[in-house]
């Protein structure tokens, strides 16, 4: 059991008080690693600035990975009316700290059957996903849990994929009286065509199976002799439309005069409902007094990055309401956070029982 009586709420509060926008996670990683050491875990910071921990010496390898970077924009950290406010309370320092305390509370029997690897990953909120990509080839789990808010009774089975697109049109400048579309108008026409294609793809589909599109930026660069227009948009992709297939469609709709660049290429993922891991979570949620609910998310997470590398049972789980992600009033209910720790610990104990009697090798 844990060597220190660290209070989980106060420990999370301390993590929230350390700003950690993507690319600047080192200080919070050191704080979390030190806390893991105080709780009796092996704790350290790796070369990607991930906060890492390990407990147990069993043959069954379990990865608990949540991200410790946040979007920009600090929120005054405060405990108010049973709610803990702060950037990252939900997305996703809260879920990762819950993972730390769940692992620290494991029984000796569970520690003999499992080796639990904790990863507080960096740059999840950036296109790089630096932390997840660093550990992907270095860890070989039998099970993986991604720390993202699902609500303490929720089990997330999948996330949509994502494709980032830059479109550019450059052409000779001409007088506005000419009956010819300018560079900006050509890009607008292209985006309208993409919207029409996506809407046709979405007919009769539930939200998780729809293609979502968002125009992120549109720029027109003034020039005397050449017109230059650029736009940036992203697509959220359902499992039936992997990034390379989406690129084929986007390229087909683009006139040859429009230059396209593609980034991200996160593969959509949806895991099965019935695995030893989902059964362990369902059991733990019921034991804590809840009713398990499976969820599919229209966003993306490190699950999209890791699923192609780790073909093992994988879910996302964490306390918190995901509708509060990135908002100026992000907070987690303290009772919800503590329930999340209870469920995570219970799921690990149940998983250990599933593998009772197994030997190394």
Curated annotation (Swiss-Prot):
Positions annotated to bind Zn(2+) 2: 91, 125, 326
The organism of origin for this protein: Thermus thermophilus (strain ATCC BAA-163 / DSM 7039 / HB27)
InterPro entries: LysK, Peptidase_M20, Peptidase_M20A
A single BP term in Gene Ontology: lysine biosynthetic process via aminoadipic acid
Class of enzymatic activity (EC top level): hydrolase
MF terms (GO), sorted A to Z: cobalt ion binding; hydrolase activity, acting on carbon-nitrogen (but not peptide) bonds, in linear amides; zinc ion binding
Entry superkingdom: Bacteria
Name of the protein described by the UniProt record: [LysW]-lysine hydrolase
Record's subcellular location: Cytoplasm
GO CC, alphabetical: cytoplasm
Pathway assignment: Amino-acid biosynthesis; L-lysine biosynthesis via AAA pathway; L-lysine from L-alpha-aminoadipate (Thermus route): step 5/5
E.C. numbers: 3.5.1.130
Taxon lineage: Bacteria, Thermotogati, Deinococcota, Deinococci, Thermales
Residues that hold Zn(2+) 1 according to the record: 67, 91, 148
């Amino acid at each position: 059991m844990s060597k220190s009586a660290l209070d989980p709420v106060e420990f999370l509060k301390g993590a929230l008080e350390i700003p950690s926008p993507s690319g600047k996670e080192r200080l919070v990683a050191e704080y979390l690693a030190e806390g893991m050491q105080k709780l009796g875990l092996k704790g350290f910071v790796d070369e990607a600035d991930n906060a890492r921990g390990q407990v147990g010496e069993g043959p069954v390898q379990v990865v608990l990975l949540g991200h410790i970077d946040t979007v920009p924009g600090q929120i005054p950290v405060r405990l108010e009316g049973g709610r803990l406010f702060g950037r990252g309370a939900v997305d996703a320092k809260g879920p990762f700290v819950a993972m730390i305390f769940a692992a620290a509370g494991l029984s000796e029997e569970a520690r003999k059957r499992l080796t639990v690897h904790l990863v507080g990953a960096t740059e999840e909120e950036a296109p790089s996903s630096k932390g997840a990509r660093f550990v992907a080839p270095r860890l070989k789990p039998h099970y993986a849990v991604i720390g993202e808010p699902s609500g303490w009774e929720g089990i997330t089975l999948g996330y949509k994929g994502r494709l980032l697109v830059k479109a550019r049109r450059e052409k000779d400048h001409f007088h506005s009286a000419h009956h010819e579309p300018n560079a900006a108008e050509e890009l607008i026409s292209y985006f309208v065509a993409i919207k029409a294609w996506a809407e046709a793809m979405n007919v009769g589909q539930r939200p998780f199976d729809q293609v979502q599109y968002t125009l992120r930026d549109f720029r027109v660069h003034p020039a005397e002799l050449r017109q230059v227009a650029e736009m940036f948009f992203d697509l959220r992709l359902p499992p039936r439309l992997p990034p390379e297939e989406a690129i084929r469609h986007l390229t087909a709709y683009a006139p040859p005069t429009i230059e396209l660049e593609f980034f991200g290429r996160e593969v959509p993922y949806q895991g099965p409902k019935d695995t030893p891991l989902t059964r362990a979570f369902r059991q733990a949620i019921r034991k804590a007094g809840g009713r398990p609910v499976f969820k599919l998310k229209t966003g993306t997470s490190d699950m999209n990055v890791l699923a192609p590398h780790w073909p093992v049972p994988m879910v996302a789980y964490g306390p918190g309401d995901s509708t509060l992600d990135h908002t100026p009033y992000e907070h987690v209910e303290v009772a919800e956070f503590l329930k999340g720790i209870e469920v995570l610990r219970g799921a690990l104990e149940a998983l250990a029982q599933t593998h009772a009697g197994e030997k190394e090798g």
